[in-house]
Amino acid sequence: MAKIRDPRFKLSRRLGVNIYGHPKAMKRATRENSREGKKLSNYGKQLLEKQKIRSYYGVLEKQFLRYVKKAMKSKERTGDVLLRSLECRLDNIAYRIGFANSIRQARQMVNHGHILVNGSKVNIPSYEVKTGDVITLREKYRKNDEFADNFLALKKFSLPYIEKDYDKFSGVLIKEPERDEIPIDANETLVVELYSK
């Protein structure tokens, strides 16, 4: 399976935004290795925003293009549909619930069958989580200190579209996320413009 292999901190500095949420990701950023302060053409800005979103969700170009085409067919605002579709990927929802400390780790957990959807094992990271779906950490992995610590450490962090049950090690997508609720720093409108040419 193809993967994005760029070093995470280096990629964050190159894009000029902490796409992985790690506190040390931007510490060594300088004007030479960061986008900050650099003038970009309109195309360059569009490309940069695409790279941010792709890198954040960890999807390759071919896969990303499928999400864009699907969003363009919708009658709703294309950028909103694009981000909503990416946000509702199983690996991302598992990360948002708190089973992992990164999307990469969440993807690995899904691949290895650690995550259940409505009680059934799903090992496809791109699986689209729907409203009402219950996402659970398999019982035998709840004793894993790393997974348990990740989950319990995020009690103070909550999103309006996810409801957590700390006793059952589960989370439910209670509604489709709105754009202003999705915690990602990117301009999806520029991405839509890029693919609309």
UniProtKB/Swiss-Prot annotation:
According to its UniProt entry, the protein's GO biological process terms are: ribosomal small subunit biogenesis; translation
Domain annotation S4 RNA-binding: ranges: 88-151
List membrane-spanning regions.
none
Q: Name one GO cellular component term.
A: small ribosomal subunit
Q: Name one Pfam family in it.
A: Ribosomal_S4
Which cysteine pairs are joined by S-S bonds?
Answer: none
Keywords, alphabetical: Ribonucleoprotein, Ribosomal protein, RNA-binding, rRNA-binding
Q: Which InterPro entries match?
A: Ribosomal_uS4 (IPR022801), Ribosomal_uS4_bac-type (IPR005709), Ribosomal_uS4_N (IPR001912), S4_RNA-bd (IPR002942), S4_RNA-bd_sf (IPR036986)
What does the UniProt record say this protein does? One of the primary rRNA binding proteins, it binds directly to 16S rRNA where it nucleates assembly of the body of the 30S subunit.
Q: Which family does it belong to?
A: Belongs to the universal ribosomal protein uS4 family.
Q: How does it assemble?
A: Part of the 30S ribosomal subunit. Contacts protein S5. The interaction surface between S4 and S5 is involved in control of translational fidelity.
Full protein name? Small ribosomal subunit protein uS4B
Organism, per UniProt?
Clostridium botulinum (strain Hall / ATCC 3502 / NCTC 13319 / Type A)
Highest classification ranks of the organism: Bacteria, Bacillati, Bacillota, Clostridia, Eubacteriales
Gene expressing this chain: rpsD2
